[in-house]
């Protein structure tokens, strides 16, 4: 579900964007345990704000530098946690996760991932596993692109509005599937995803629009059909 979006103006600080989204969640009375942020929010002002707010968070940290910087922490064979001070003087606790990923030839090579950890006692593997779940957000964006309206207009407000409508449609599908595709069984609620896939939802939307506005079944042409039909 997408609970809040923010129209980012040129030059707007990332901390302002984050505070706007968090205030919207507060209005909705939505509570959460841990905040997961991508690399764009790995800034000193955001770290200070979350630390002072005592908000548990995991933030992806870019690995920079050739030998120094956070790249100097990419040593050894095992994952670990360590304290680190950024160039702007902001202290942070980092989880350095060593992963093995295959290259083009199929050989597995070591790849380091860095996460800024705030008010969490978790081990590195738990941090890595929980943050990976965040990639489900990307799936909602891919679904949104299937139902958003497309335009050649360069008006950013119009584009933002169409994006918002697409996200509302995805939220609608999530709600309908949660209510009508659930399994009737004791215990916690489970959903059978095969009963109402997103593709079927989009087909139903198309049919509803065609029923409301009609559909085009022919085109004007100056060529007789008999001349091209054999």
Where do the PLM segments sit?
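An anionic, glycine-rich sequence signature occurring as long contiguous blocks
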Residues: 53-144
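Acidic, metal-coordinating catalytic cores used for nucleic-acid/nucleotide bond scission
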Residues: 36-44, 63-65
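Electropositive, glycine- and tryptophan-enriched low-complexity nucleic-acid-binding patches
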Residues: 1-30, 111
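Short, surface-exposed basic-aromatic patches at helix termini and helix-loop junctions that form
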Residues: 23-28, 47-56
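Short active-site oxyanion
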Residues: 32-34
